[in-house]
Amino acid sequence: MKRIILSLVAVTLIGLNLNAQNMNKKALVVYFSVTGNTATVANNLADAIGADIFEIEPMQLYTSDDLDWTDENSRSSIEMKDSKARPEMNNNLDDAKEYDLIYLGFPIWWYTAPKIVNTFLEKTDMAGKTIVLFATSGGSGMENTVESLKPSAPKATFKRGKVLSKDASQEELKEFAKTALK
């Protein structure tokens, strides 16, 4: 009986230690936003967890015509059909070395992340990082996100995360940040 109790105590302490290690990691919230919904969530998440923040800025801003998914000739439709499309960024994250944990947010386009997110991952050394994905969406899920992003940062560990509402409370965002690491 003593062994069982000691084993349970040891397992509990190990679990608490792992959780404390995750909470002590330096976090960065990175996001791409066109309409402002993902920016709202990203800024609120960074505030809720005390993380730094970085916005992925496209070299050429997207217009409402660019985002018309019903038009097969719109910019976003063309980019999303081309697996090699990598829209240029207007900025770069100079150094990600100080961060262990990256919360990466974006709007869902065609059940996955916009191609500029791949551009960011390929331009930034993500080796050894844990990347927790989050998204905003008008109704689509995140079904293909890890699969489409992993090749752009093969030495990172991806966590699927979830779709978040721009109206998510600080408590909801803290809970998301905590449970996403499990």
List the model feature ranges, each with a label.
Residues 132-165:
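Short, glycine-/small-residue-rich phosphate/pyrophosphate-handling segment
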